[in-house]
Amino acid sequence: SVVSSPVVRLYEEDALRLGKKDKFPYVGTTYRLTEHFHTWTKHARLNAIAQPEQFVEISEGLAKAKGIANGDRVTVSSMRGFIRAVAVVTRRLQTLNVNGQQVETVGIPLHWGFEGVARKGYIANTLTPNVGDSNSQTPEYKAFLVNIEKA
C-alpha cells in the first residue's frame, strides 16, 4: 500500500518568511534555458556566449505598468531576498486571469550564480520559499510572490 500526504512541508520559522500580496504582488517562477542546461552556464563557454547575462522575463503589460523597458536593469525581490538582472520584455508571458483577477508573472531562469564562464549573477533560489512536498521533499520553485522595480 502507498502512503502519501496531501499537505505541504512548511516549518514554523519559514512560514514567517512568506510574502504577502500587498508587498509582493506578482508571481515569480523559475525555469531552465536550453542554452544553459544544468551546470553548462558554469562550464560551457559557447553557451555563455549565446546567453551571457542573467535576465528576467516580464510581459508587455507589466513592463508598461512599472515603466520598465527591454534591457533595463531591474531588482526582483521576495520576502527572502533579491536579485538584479536585465529585463526582457516579451510576448511569451501574458497577463493571466485567475478567478477574475489579473495576475502578472516574472520569469526567472535559474542558471546564474557566483561562479562560471558566463557573467556572474544572483542565485534565483534566493527568492524562492522554503516550502516543499511532504512526500518527495521536492521544493516549490514554480510559484512564489515577488515584486519587480527598475534598479
Ranges and model annotations:
Residues 39-151:
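Long, contiguous, secondary-structure-rich segments that constitute the structural scaffold
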Residues 1-44:
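Long, low-complexity segments enriched in small/aliphatic residues
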